[in-house]
Amino acid sequence: MDSSPVTYSGEPPYKLRRLSPSYPYVSKLRERCASKIETLSEGSARDSLEEEDVSEAMATGAFLATRLYLPSVLPQRITTLTFLDHFKKSRPLPNSDKRLNPIFYRLAYIRDLVGEMELEGIVERGTASRLLGASSPAGFVAGTYTHARDLSKTMSLASVRDAVLAIEAQTRDQSESQLWALLRRGLATASTMKWGALGPQYHPQWCEVSTNAKGIPNNPALQFGQTNERTARSLISALYVARSEAATPDLLVDPGCGQCFVFDESASVPGDAYACGLLMDARTGVVGASLDMLVCDRDPSGVLSPHSTQTTLDFFEIKCRAKYLFDPDLFSPVATAYANLLKHRTAVCLRKFLRSIKNPAVEYFASTSVPGATEALITCNSSWKPREVNETNRRCGDFDRDHIALNLDASSDVWLFSEPDLESETITPARWDTGELALSVPVFANPRHPNFKQILVQAYVLSGHFPDHQLRPFLVTFIGRHRKRCEEGKTFTICDRPEGSPYNLNEVVHSSCAIPILLFVTPVIVDREGCWEDIEIESLTAFNKTADAIWDSDSPADVSEPTSS
């Protein structure tokens, strides 16, 4: 076999076709964002993988055979093992002024949880210790209680990050995974945080509230969102994310029959390939977030692993608005407004369609006032001012006001979709009267809305794992309609332009999903420097208060030397 190095294109595996560094931002914000975002070299970089590196990667045996596996469906006994119950069995360190980083209490719980799975026989022996980076994984022993103090002495920052990212890879089914639901209990999220005038705050009983929280409510609006989220992901994948012409191998190996490329199997369906599991804050282990869509490569084990030339991570929070759902065959204000929008394809008709319901998805507020907290999308552009405006004397704190100013100059892309082609079974975006496929409108994300806070927390958590990458979050708003009788039971493939052919046959609108009408893609700008430290400090403070409440002052401390992180 030729011993010369095997090379492959160093071009990143994913590129955003239409989200360039300066778009869709406008005004002064465009210049600032453009200056912050690093651009890739126009020349194609070349990387190489030496045979000796391949041998080292395979030295421990067949790497695919040792891929970590954690089940999504759990026995009833396992589902009752919560972080809070595990933490209540811990003990304070000898010197109360020296505390462990809470991440080690979280990982100690996860190790024992996976250990119980070993005892149940639903995962391989040694999985618990292998998850936490043990060089010689050993089987879990019944009755074991892992002390956070011990982990803090043996785990490096790299092994902590690896363990947290491995958990993310095993929980990508999100709400369909019992493991995802169990690990979220006892984690702080954007919804369990309180947001005061100066930023994030914690409820005194935040851990108890999170642990005892009921499951996701089963109402029509949420059902609509869960059903159509994958359609929105496919639309984003088709309209914004393009695979590079030369695919990037996750690992190049020689299994004995010649060199070959090995790719992450989960990436075979692009929309689902970008789905994320539960990400825990690598800084503290207190905060958790689950992203709807993250444009990032994964290694052969399914773990997030940005390509070496990828400097920007784009992620999307998807919201499907059920309140616009209508039957196109019935005469109604929404159906009429939609017919006019599809006929004329103007910004005026777009505004009329959005206002065809009682509470439009875009709220107008005067530039001298502040928006409410009801709608996730807002505008203060005079062309969007309705005939009747209720004047209010709303107030908001500095935290929200600063973020309103930061997002004020941002604009949204709006995509309008043609009626499905029943013969070719495709759906394509329609051109607006301007000739554009994506109409830029002066609509931005509302910092007072829970969706904005959710994205802010997601960005904070993600930044802890990839601190050297520029983050670009977007809020995606999907609006769809009921199917006509002739459309029922059909799966439609998405084209990225009217005259184009399907770019990827896996980017589809499934038969159970609504027919897409509109897609808003809105950039979200957060004050990274002002937020990250606040969230981290508040998280540590909240955890320490919870620990103090649990640990009685007379409880016997561990006899070992205290460890601080």
Swiss-Prot record:
SUPFAM superfamilies: Restriction endonuclease-like. It is found in: Host nucleus; Host cytoplasm. GO terms for cellular component: host cell cytoplasm; host cell nucleus. Belongs to the herpesviridae alkaline nuclease family. Plays a role in processing non linear or branched viral DNA intermediates in order to promote the production of mature packaged unit-length linear progeny viral DNA molecules. Exhibits endonuclease and exonuclease activities and accepts both double-stranded and single-stranded DNA as substrate. Exonuclease digestion of DNA is in the 5'-> 3' direction and the products are 5'-monophosphate nucleosides. Additionally, forms a recombinase with the major DNA-binding protein, which displays strand exchange activity. Keywords: Endonuclease, Exonuclease, Host cytoplasm, Host nucleus, Host-virus interaction, Hydrolase, Nuclease. The keyword Hydrolase applies. Gene3D superfamilies: 3.90.320.10. This is Alkaline nuclease. Its EC number is 3.1.-.-.
